[in-house]
A protein has these predicted regions:
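Core AdoMet radical
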Residues: 72-88, 94-199, 209-216, 239-242
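Short, charged low-complexity linear segments at domain edges
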Residues: 29-50
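Canonical Radical SAM [4Fe-4S] cluster-binding loop centered on the CxxxCxxC motif
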Residues: 43-86
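Glycine-rich, proline-tolerant flexible connector loops at the mouths of alpha/beta enzymes
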Residues: 52-55, 75, 103-115, 247-257, ...
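Conserved, mostly hydrophobic/aromatic
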Residues: 37, 65, 104, 203, ...
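Active-site glycine- and acidic-residue-rich loops that bind
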Residues: 142-149, 215-230, 289-296
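Auxiliary Fe-S-binding modules of radical SAM enzymes
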Residues: 1-28, 95, 234-408
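Generic structural signal for well-ordered alpha-helices
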Residues: 53, 91, 118-126, 152, ...
């Protein structure tokens, strides 16, 4: 067998290589994997970590995905929908406080009222976030489930800036049996993996940056399944990846299957992040909030293993308890103003820095679409200080206090 250090120097990996790396468990081997992935990240993507301010628009959902705490048939959840003013207000706050982009997430709905509601929000967010720092307005990621192509196109037009428009829709598992386990409740509406892939094709045709991902540690999942997931990422030619550990939900109907031992699940999730970074290289990878549900510093460790995106929760505190896809979701009692400050400190502790006022589009997307010019990254200390100073000032120019101690 090839020495691990030699394997980690490769630029191409066989399926056997991937399975071997995913299965690493000893502290020494995992440290070597982490170092290789961290180096790959900073060499290819730079040292910045990009924020996607998460706005959990609504927990009303028409789907019955069996793993999910806000599934339609969970009648213990108090349903809510933020108002248009609340959603736009949070997006404007994000733009004024240095966030380059926001993510609107909600349960899946395809009714005309919801589609029009999101359309109005997108138009207003674009119009109300254009500024000197963000001349195209704040970047937008949507995570609103499977939709028709006409809906994707309507939302793309409403966004005002397709170049900085993203859509996140995870296929959860490339194994049809596992996908069925997660999404098909007896006698209920059924999800179809092929239709999910059709949505991906429509999204690209409409000009979105495509984001997808999987659950890690699904009951019955194998390392070979995860390897096939990685190969599917390549085949789909995705721009960003959001994946995290499978965590049971008391609101779902799979809780009797349990979940992996937390320590083992954490390491497998980190290994998956690292291997995806080594294999795909130039995509954006999010450090999932679910990692923090296992360990308080889970997202920071995810950054060490190859992630370069985090999603601070900007949802008003009063809504957070109603949007729990899994048990023990962190930060339920925090307000949006606490998240950015806290995360910047955590990111700095791992030798990285926040990309304030930057869209943070992946290098893969820019290459795929022929955009040779990379988003401007200030090189001198003076330029960096000037950019940070802009991010530190709120709408009336008052200075916000952040923790900025990363060496440059």
């Amino acid at each position: 067998m090839k020495p691990l250090e030699e394997l980690l120097q490769q630029t191409e990996f066989s399926d056997d290589d991937i399975v071997r790396l995913l299965g690493l468990t000893t502290p020494e081997d995992c440290l070597a994997l982490k170092r290789a992935a961290y180096k790959k990240t900073t060499d290819v993507m730079g040292d910045r970590v990009f924020f996607r301010g998460l706005i959990e628009v609504s927990n009303i959902c028409t789907a019955n995905c069996r793993y999910c705490g806000i599934r339609k048939d969970n009648h213990d959840v108090k349903r809510y929908e933020m108002t248009e003013d609340e959603i736009v207000g949070q997006a404007v706050w994000a733009a004024e406080n240095g966030y380059g982009s926001v993510c609107l997430q909600a349960g899946e709905r395809r009714d005309a009222k919801f589609i029009d509601f999101i359309t109005r929000c997108l138009k207003r967010i674009h119009a109300e976030t254009v500024s000197e720092e963000l001349p195209d307005g704040v970047g937008i990621t949507l995570s609103l489930g499977d939709q028709e192509k006409t809906t994707f196109e309507t939302w793309a037009q409403a966004s005002g800036n397709r170049r900085n428009l993203r859509y996140l829709s995870r296929f959860e598992s490339s194994n049809p049996d596992l996908f069925k386990l997660l999404h098909t409740a007896p006698g209920k509406n059924q999800k179809n993996l092929e239709h999910r892939f059709q949505c991906f094709r429509w999204l690209k045709e409409c000009g979105y940056q495509l984001g997808t991902g999987v659950m890690i540690g699904i009951p019955g999942q194998t390392l070979e399944d995860l390897c096939r997931d990685i190969r599917l990422f390549q085949k789909l030619d995705v721009d960003m990846i959001g994946m995290g550990p499978y965590l049971k939900s008391d609101g779902g109907d799979l809780k009797e299957l349990g979940q992996m031992d937390p320590k083992a699940l954490m390491q497998l999730s980190l290994n998956m992040i690292a291997v995806v970074r080594l294999v795909l290289g130039d995509v954006n990878i999010a450090a999932a909030t679910a990692l923090q549900a296992i360990r308080d510093d889970g997202r920071e460790i995810g950054i060490e293993y190859g992630a370069n995106v985090v999603m601070p929760n900007l949802s008003p505190q009063r809504f957070r308890a109603g949007y729990q896809l899994y048990d023990n979701k962190p930060c339920l009692n925090d307000e949006p103003t606490q998240c950015g400050d806290c995360l910047e400190k955590r990111i700095a502790s791992r030798g990285r820095r926040v990309g304030w006022n930057m869209m943070g589009s992946s290098r893969h997307y820019r290459t795929r679409t022929g955009q040779t010019a990379q988003e401007a990254i200030p090189e001198s200390t003076a330029q960096r200080d000037a950019l940070n100073e802009k991010a530190l000032r709120g709408p009336q120019g008052q200075r916000r206090i952040f923790f900025n101690t990363v060496a440059v």
